[in-house]
Amino acid sequence: MQTQGRVAGKVSAKTTLPEAHSRGYLPHIEGAEFQMITYRLGDALPKDVMQRLTLLDREKRHTATEQLLDAGYGQCWLAYPNIAKIIIDNWLYFAGKRYTILAYVVMPNHVHVLIRVFEGSLLAKIVQSWKSYTAKQIATQLSLNGLKPERPIWQPDYWDRFIRNQT
């Protein structure tokens, strides 16, 4: 099951100069208005595969990771409509306040969301709040059904792609 959506909003063509930072995993860009974000469930890739991926350069690692995620490894908790709804409702909660959602898709073991970050909001804080809140909600939902994830709900980091207008 894939849950897709598009939320309309006023989109500015203005971009600001981005600032890069890293928590030691992946480099991230702040200050960029348009961002494509991907994050995955904690069990979406086996540990041995993740170790092999570190040997690849960034672009090849990203491509290989996307292919592996699309193969549907792990518990695929996001395939359940009630779990996918937690994710979507969470994104929509701050839409219009911290960011505009342009498009999203919830896959069985990972998500993609395209947003325009508002001035004064930090992408790292936005993603951290999404993952923190939804991890608690998903764990609660799973426990109500007698299920418990073997690994943390979410991976420790996320992929972001700064979208720029070069016209």
What kind of region is each of these model predictions?
Residues 1-167:
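Short catalytic/metal-binding and nucleic-acid-binding patches
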